[in-house]
């Protein structure tokens, strides 16, 4: 169950292509039409216009492997969580599916496609923000709990 980065990327993109996603190439590391930043720092950054309502020319299901560079992390390089340049795999629903499908698919990808041991998978869920009145994501918590209790 060892994969090179190229094999993992290809497996991920093919998996979501089979779920009806259109594959888009990585956007430039130097963002176009975004004077707020020097570099593309996340997979979401090039998708932002579509996440806030602009129609994507390829439809409502998009998948990519976005190259990202984070200059702010340079001082933290060397620990087990920070890198400067990396690729973010993303599958995007632009008004199509939501949490149930996303959680089911990514679990299937991890466990059945990659063969990961479910007992070694850790999930984080948005805990909310009292200051802004945003509640914890209890729906996602419940959906993930179902995955971890399935036989």
List where the protein language model places each region.
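Structured aminoacyl-transfer and RNA-binding surfaces used for tRNA recognition/handling
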Residues: 1-151
């Amino acid at each position: 169950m060892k994969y090179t980065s190229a094999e993992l990327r290809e497996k991920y993109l093919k998996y979501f292509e089979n779920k009806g996603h259109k594959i888009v190439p990585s956007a430039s590391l130097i963002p176009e039409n975004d004077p707020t930043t020097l570099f593309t720092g996340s997979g979401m950054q090039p998708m932002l216009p579509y996440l806030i309502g602009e129609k994507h020319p390829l439809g409502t299901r998009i998948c990519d492997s976005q190259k990202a560079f984070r200059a702010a992390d340079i001082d933290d390089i060397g620990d087990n969580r920070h890198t400067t340049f990396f690729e973010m795999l993303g599958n995007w629903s632009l008004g199509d599916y939501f949490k149930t499908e996303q959680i089911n698919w990514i679990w299937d990808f991890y466990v059945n496609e990659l063969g990961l041991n479910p007992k070694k998978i850790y999930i984080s869920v948005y805990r909310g923000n009292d200051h802004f009145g945003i509640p914890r994501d209890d729906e996602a918590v419940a959906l993930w709990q179902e995955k971890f209790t399935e036989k």
